[in-house]
Amino acid sequence: MAKQSMKAREVKRAKLVVKFAEQRATLKTTINDVNATDEDRWSAMLKLQTLPRDSSPVRKRNRCSVTGRPHGFLRKFGMSRIKVREHMMRGEIPGLKKASW
């Protein structure tokens, strides 16, 4: 189980990403616009750097919804591989069964 503080930190990051997404997108379009002046592009770059570091979607980490485990995360289920296996063995995930050949 992950510490509660780590789970809370990820929730905080997710909120920041949503809050600053539009502002970040407009600044990035200005920076990548070849028709914009160099001064505009430079000022947009400086404004982008003043935004909170955790507002970048790259910093968000996928975690298991049950345990908070950061590794072995399966996007389709939103859980770690360990919890997916446990739920699968109990028959709680429809259509999933242990492989045998």
UniProtKB/Swiss-Prot annotation:
Q: State the PROSITE patterns in the record.
A: RIBOSOMAL_S14 (PS00527)
Give the top-rank taxon of the lineage listed in the UniProt record for this protein: Bacteria
What are the annotated GO cellular component locations? cytoplasm; small ribosomal subunit
Q: Mind telling me which Pfam families this protein's record contains?
A: Ribosomal_S14
- The entry's keywords: Ribonucleoprotein, Ribosomal protein, RNA-binding, rRNA-binding
GO terms in the biological process aspect are: translation
InterPro entries linked: Ribosomal_uS14, Ribosomal_uS14_bac/plastid, Ribosomal_uS14_CS
Q: Name one GO molecular function term.
A: structural constituent of ribosome
Role according to the record: Binds 16S rRNA, required for the assembly of 30S particles and may also be responsible for determining the conformation of the 16S rRNA at the A site.
PANTHER family listed in its UniProt record: 30S RIBOSOMAL PROTEIN S14 (PTHR19836), SMALL RIBOSOMAL SUBUNIT PROTEIN US14M (PTHR19836:SF19)
Tell me the protein family, please: Belongs to the universal ribosomal protein uS14 family.
Assembly and partners are described as:
Part of the 30S ribosomal subunit. Contacts proteins S3 and S10.
Task: Supply the name of the protein.
Answer: Small ribosomal subunit protein uS14
Q: Which organism is it from?
A: Psychromonas ingrahamii (strain DSM 17664 / CCUG 51855 / 37)
Ranked from the top, the taxonomy reads: Bacteria, Pseudomonadati, Pseudomonadota, Gammaproteobacteria, Alteromonadales
Question: What's the name of its gene?
Answer: rpsN
